[in-house]
Amino acid sequence: MSSKSQLTYSARAQSHPNPLARKLFQVAEEKRSNVTVSADVTTTKELLDLADRLGPYIAVIKTHIDILSDFSQETIDGLNALAQKHNFLIFEDRKFIDIGNTVQKQYHNGTLRISEWAHIINCSILPGEGIVEALAQTAQATDFPYGSERGLLILAEMTSKGSLATGAYTSASVDIARKYPSFVLGFVSTRSLGEVESTEAPAQGEDFVVFTTGVNLSSKGDKLGQQYQTPQSAVGRGADFIISGRGIYAAADPVEAAKQYQQQGWEAYLARVGAQ
């Protein structure tokens, strides 16, 4: 799989075929941040407070909206308003994993109304290509009101110990992504997938975005099998955007922590593209 990780965000924004990826890189460049904060809190008040306090220092906020005990229209309106105020994108870490007909309803209808507020979603390809096809059909339908403002990341790898998202599964993730370049932004993975073998030929201008989870400056793991890496190691391995949860929101001072991740993530990016 081709990789453009040695290019600057601004260069990739200018040439990228996917409009949401262009916006994502533009946000990163404007804010000098490649940080995605995983806001794994359980109330709307906590979520909106974090989004407001950390918003100036992040490119993306990642939610697990189904862990909120009080999800409502207030949650949607608040997130959308803060995304506008602080110029960040919203990534709902729903990890869709079902048959196509079901995920279409989960995405565009249902209690959580994900398509209304999440710029980015993700899925596992364990159900097969149909899950990506179904989500793409929904997002690209003529009556879908959000058009090019929505995109998908394929969960190609995970950072948990013993993960089965390896080998043939990861290769299949690349194969499927190449069939839906106008909707699939890239991958959640632990590295650039440039060396992964694929049966699908790359399209001209291919430039998949890599989000890497499990970034933490103060810990190497937890008791449940999570394995962490630093911003430097993640970006060095090909991450375009680093995802940190507890390293930021559970810090004694989340704002200062966000600033630290922003600085280290950005310095690692500059080193990668040779701008330092």
From Swiss-Prot:
A Pfam short name: OMPdecase
PANTHER family in UniProt: OROTIDINE 5'-PHOSPHATE DECARBOXYLASE
Record bears the keyword Lyase: yes
Record-listed substrate binding positions: 40, 62-64, 93-102, 228, 246
E.C. designation(s): 4.1.1.23
Pathway where this protein functions: Pyrimidine metabolism; UMP biosynthesis via de novo pathway; UMP from orotate: step 2/2
Catalysed conversion reaction: orotidine 5'-phosphate + H(+) = UMP + CO2
Gene expressing this chain: pyrG
Official protein name in the record: Orotidine 5'-phosphate decarboxylase
SUPFAM superfamilies the UniProt entry points to: Ribulose-phoshate binding barrel
